[in-house]
A protein has these predicted regions:
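Positively charged n-region of N-terminal signal peptides that target proteins for export
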Residues: 1-4
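Bacterial N-terminal signal peptides
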Residues: 7-15
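Intrinsic disorder/low-complexity segments
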Residues: 17-19
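Primary mode marks residue(s) on the alpha4-beta5-alpha5 output face of response regulator receiver
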Residues: 21-135
Length: 135
């Protein structure tokens, strides 16, 4: 009985430590696109299916990074960083890209530009990308 209890305790500890490491790995992956000089102070988010996000790490500068891997119209590996002020534009991009058809996405972007509903980027902001067939 003591062996079973010890085994279960060990399994719980290992499981808990694995879960605790997952956010760190997500943060590290998202930060791959960030310039080294901005990396330590960057905010890291994780996009949700409803185009809102959870903050994985609060930063001290204006840079925000996130993983786009697995999202429609993205490379097999895709991470991106930009200004916090651009998050509404990113959310709009994600909504348009969710249909998974580049031609339809472009048509939606063009229509939003034409009718004035396209979210403007922060003037002078930069977008950093790291993407490709694998990490």
């Amino acid at each position: 009985m003591k062996r079973i209890a010890l085994f279960l305790f060990g399994a719980i500890v290992v499981s808990a430590s694995a879960l605790a490491q997952a956010p760190d790995a997500a943060v590290e992956t998202a930060l791959l696109a960030a310039p080294a000089s901005l990396r330590d102070g960057a905010t890291v988010i994780k996009w949700k299916a409803d185009f809102t996000y959870d903050t994985l790490r609060k930063g001290t500068n204006r840079l925000v990074c996130y993983d786009r891997t697995g999202l429609p119209e993205q490379q097999p590996f895709s991470v991106e960083c930009t200004s916090l002020a651009n998050l509404d534009r990113v959310a709009q991009n994600l909504k348009f890209e969710a249909i998974g058809d580049k031609i339809k996405t472009q048509a939606m972007l063009d229509a939003a530009e034409k009718d004035g509903t396209r979210v403007k980027p922060e003037y002078g902001s930069v977008w950093y990308h790291m993407l490709g067939p694998d990490r």
